Amino acid sequence: MIKQDVQKCVDALQDFVDKEIGESVNLFSCKSRANNELLLNIDEKFQLKDKDELHQLGEQKIENQNKLQEIRNKVEYYEKLLTELEEAQKELEVRYKLVSKSK
């Protein structure tokens, strides 16, 4: 009798485990299909660049950064030049005033 009760418990436990495994497998399958569909949609929307094109874009980026740095250097040079010209203009104004007063 105990053996039968134990067997019933084992059978009930096995049924429960089988049911849970079935539900888990079903849920996993549904999520896998949904993820696969999502990946397909993403793949359609966003085309990946090939290695050559990515390399070319990288080189273009470096070239653009170098050009930008050159422009920044020129701007800095012209700003310094402007400051020097403003100082020279002030000196000339002072000299002009001194010359005008001495006449």
Swiss-Prot record:
State a GO cellular component annotated for this protein.
endosome
**Which coarse location class applies to the principal site listed for this UniProt protein?**
other
Q: Is the keyword Coiled coil assigned to this protein?
A: yes
Q: Which UniProt keywords apply?
A: Coiled coil, Endosome, Transport
Concerning InterPro entries, the annotation shows: BLI1 (IPR020491)
Q: Which residues form a coiled coil?
A: 51-102
Locations listed in the record = Endosome
- The source's domain of life comes to Eukaryota
Q: Name the family.
A: Belongs to the BLI1 family.
- Function (record text): Component of the biogenesis of lysosome-related organelles complex-1 (BLOC-1) involved in endosomal cargo sorting.
Q: How does it assemble?
A: Component of the biogenesis of lysosome-related organelles complex-1 (BLOC-1).
Q: What is this protein called?
A: Biogenesis of lysosome-related organelles complex 1 subunit BLI1
Species of provenance: Candida glabrata (strain ATCC 2001 / BCRC 20586 / JCM 3761 / NBRC 0622 / NRRL Y-65 / CBS 138)
The lineage is: Eukaryota, Fungi, Dikarya, Ascomycota, Saccharomycotina
Give the encoding gene's name: BLI1
